[in-house]
Amino acid sequence: MTMDTAQLKSQIQQYLVESGNYELISNELKARLLQEGWVDKVKDLTKSEMNINESTNFTQILSTVEPKALEMVSDSTRETVLKQIREFLEGIVDTQ
Protein backbone atom coordinates (compact mmCIF):
# COMPACT_ATOMS: atom_id res chain seq x y z
CA MET A 1 0.00 0.00 0.00
CA THR A 2 1.55 3.30 -1.05
CA MET A 3 0.56 6.75 -0.04
CA ASP A 4 0.60 9.48 -2.65
CA THR A 5 2.61 12.64 -2.12
CA ALA A 6 -0.43 14.84 -1.46
CA GLN A 7 -1.68 12.52 1.30
CA LEU A 8 1.74 12.34 2.90
CA LYS A 9 2.15 16.11 2.77
CA SER A 10 -1.30 16.57 4.30
CA GLN A 11 -0.56 14.15 7.14
CA ILE A 12 2.79 15.78 7.88
CA GLN A 13 1.20 19.23 7.93
CA GLN A 14 -1.56 18.01 10.23
CA TYR A 15 0.92 16.43 12.63
CA LEU A 16 3.14 19.50 12.49
CA VAL A 17 0.22 21.69 13.58
CA GLU A 18 -1.15 19.25 16.17
CA SER A 19 2.25 18.73 17.80
CA GLY A 20 2.85 22.47 18.14
CA ASN A 21 5.98 22.26 16.00
CA TYR A 22 4.44 24.37 13.24
CA GLU A 23 4.01 27.26 15.64
CA LEU A 24 7.54 26.85 17.03
CA ILE A 25 9.14 26.80 13.58
CA SER A 26 6.95 29.63 12.34
CA ASN A 27 7.74 31.82 15.36
CA GLU A 28 11.47 31.17 14.98
CA LEU A 29 11.32 32.10 11.31
CA LYS A 30 9.33 35.29 11.98
CA ALA A 31 11.70 36.39 14.75
CA ARG A 32 14.80 35.80 12.63
CA LEU A 33 13.34 37.60 9.61
CA LEU A 34 12.36 40.59 11.75
CA GLN A 35 15.74 40.66 13.48
CA GLU A 36 17.58 40.62 10.15
CA GLY A 37 15.47 43.44 8.73
CA TRP A 38 14.10 41.16 6.02
CA VAL A 39 10.50 42.26 6.59
CA ASP A 40 11.37 45.94 6.10
CA LYS A 41 13.44 45.15 3.01
CA VAL A 42 10.55 43.23 1.47
CA LYS A 43 8.12 46.05 2.29
CA ASP A 44 10.48 48.52 0.59
CA LEU A 45 10.87 46.23 -2.40
CA THR A 46 7.09 45.90 -2.69
CA LYS A 47 6.54 49.66 -2.46
CA SER A 48 9.19 50.22 -5.11
CA GLU A 49 7.62 47.66 -7.40
CA MET A 50 4.20 49.25 -6.92
CA ASN A 51 5.58 52.69 -7.80
CA ILE A 52 7.33 51.40 -10.91
CA ASN A 53 4.30 49.46 -12.15
CA GLU A 54 1.28 51.44 -11.00
CA SER A 55 -1.16 49.47 -13.13
CA THR A 56 -0.17 46.03 -11.83
CA ASN A 57 -2.36 43.96 -9.57
CA PHE A 58 -1.53 41.90 -6.49
CA THR A 59 -0.76 38.73 -8.45
CA GLN A 60 1.68 40.54 -10.72
CA ILE A 61 3.44 42.25 -7.81
CA LEU A 62 3.65 38.97 -5.91
CA SER A 63 5.15 37.16 -8.90
CA THR A 64 7.85 39.84 -9.12
CA VAL A 65 8.57 40.31 -5.42
CA GLU A 66 8.33 36.73 -4.13
CA PRO A 67 11.41 35.30 -5.89
CA LYS A 68 13.49 38.31 -4.83
CA ALA A 69 12.20 38.06 -1.25
CA LEU A 70 13.07 34.37 -1.06
CA GLU A 71 16.60 35.14 -2.26
CA MET A 72 16.93 37.77 0.47
CA VAL A 73 16.48 35.22 3.29
CA SER A 74 19.88 34.80 4.89
CA ASP A 75 21.69 31.49 4.62
CA SER A 76 21.81 31.16 8.41
CA THR A 77 18.04 31.60 8.74
CA ARG A 78 17.38 29.20 5.89
CA GLU A 79 19.73 26.60 7.39
CA THR A 80 18.29 26.96 10.90
CA VAL A 81 14.68 26.55 9.79
CA LEU A 82 15.47 23.67 7.44
CA LYS A 83 17.36 21.96 10.27
CA GLN A 84 14.29 22.29 12.52
CA ILE A 85 12.07 20.83 9.80
CA ARG A 86 14.48 17.94 9.16
CA GLU A 87 14.65 17.15 12.89
CA PHE A 88 10.86 17.16 13.06
CA LEU A 89 10.59 14.85 10.04
CA GLU A 90 13.24 12.49 11.38
CA GLY A 91 11.20 12.22 14.57
CA ILE A 92 8.05 11.09 12.78
CA VAL A 93 9.24 9.23 9.70
CA ASP A 94 10.34 5.63 10.00
CA THR A 95 13.40 5.32 7.77
CA GLN A 96 13.72 1.55 8.05
Curated annotation (Swiss-Prot):
<keyword id="KW-0156">Chromatin regulator</keyword>
<keyword id="KW-0804">Transcription</keyword>
<keyword id="KW-0539">Nucleus</keyword>
<dbReference type="InterPro" id="IPR018783">
    <property type="entry name" value="TF_ENY2"/>
</dbReference>
<keyword id="KW-0653">Protein transport</keyword>
<keyword id="KW-0813">Transport</keyword>
<dbReference type="GO" id="GO:0005654">
    <property type="term" value="C:nucleoplasm"/>
</dbReference>
<dbReference type="InterPro" id="IPR038212">
    <property type="entry name" value="TF_EnY2_sf"/>
</dbReference>
<protein>
    <recommendedName>
        <fullName>Transcription and mRNA export factor SUS1</fullName>
    </recommendedName>
</protein>
<dbReference type="GO" id="GO:0006325">
    <property type="term" value="P:chromatin organization"/>
</dbReference>
<keyword id="KW-0509">mRNA transport</keyword>
<dbReference type="GO" id="GO:0070390">
    <property type="term" value="C:transcription export complex 2"/>
</dbReference>
<comment type="similarity">
    <text>Belongs to the ENY2 family.</text>
</comment>
<keyword id="KW-0832">Ubl conjugation</keyword>
<dbReference type="GO" id="GO:0071819">
    <property type="term" value="C:DUBm complex"/>
</dbReference>
<comment type="subunit">
    <text>Component of the nuclear pore complex (NPC)-associated TREX-2 complex (transcription and export complex 2), composed of at least SUS1, SAC3, THP1, SEM1, and CDC31. TREX-2 contains 2 SUS1 chains. The TREX-2 complex interacts with the nucleoporin NUP1. Component of the 1.8 MDa SAGA transcription coactivator-HAT complex. SAGA is built of 5 distinct domains with specialized functions. Within the SAGA complex, SUS1, SGF11, SGF73 and UBP8 form an additional subcomplex of SAGA called the DUB module (deubiquitination module). Interacts directly with THP1, SAC3, SGF11, and with the RNA polymerase II.</text>
</comment>
<dbReference type="GO" id="GO:0006368">
    <property type="term" value="P:transcription elongation by RNA polymerase II"/>
</dbReference>
<keyword id="KW-0963">Cytoplasm</keyword>
<dbReference type="GO" id="GO:0003713">
    <property type="term" value="F:transcription coactivator activity"/>
</dbReference>
<dbReference type="GO" id="GO:0015031">
    <property type="term" value="P:protein transport"/>
</dbReference>
<dbReference type="GO" id="GO:0000932">
    <property type="term" value="C:P-body"/>
</dbReference>
<keyword id="KW-1017">Isopeptide bond</keyword>
<dbReference type="GO" id="GO:0006406">
    <property type="term" value="P:mRNA export from nucleus"/>
</dbReference>
<dbReference type="GO" id="GO:0005643">
    <property type="term" value="C:nuclear pore"/>
</dbReference>
<dbReference type="Pfam" id="PF10163">
    <property type="entry name" value="EnY2"/>
</dbReference>
<keyword id="KW-0805">Transcription regulation</keyword>
<dbReference type="GO" id="GO:0000124">
    <property type="term" value="C:SAGA complex"/>
</dbReference>
<keyword id="KW-0010">Activator</keyword>
<keyword id="KW-0811">Translocation</keyword>
<feature type="cross-link" description="Glycyl lysine isopeptide (Lys-Gly) (interchain with G-Cter in ubiquitin)">
    <location>
        <position position="68"/>
    </location>
</feature>
<comment type="function">
    <text>Involved in mRNA export coupled transcription activation by association with both the TREX-2 and the SAGA complexes. At the promoters, SAGA is required for recruitment of the basal transcription machinery. It influences RNA polymerase II transcriptional activity through different activities such as TBP interaction and promoter selectivity, interaction with transcription activators, and chromatin modification through histone acetylation and deubiquitination.</text>
</comment>
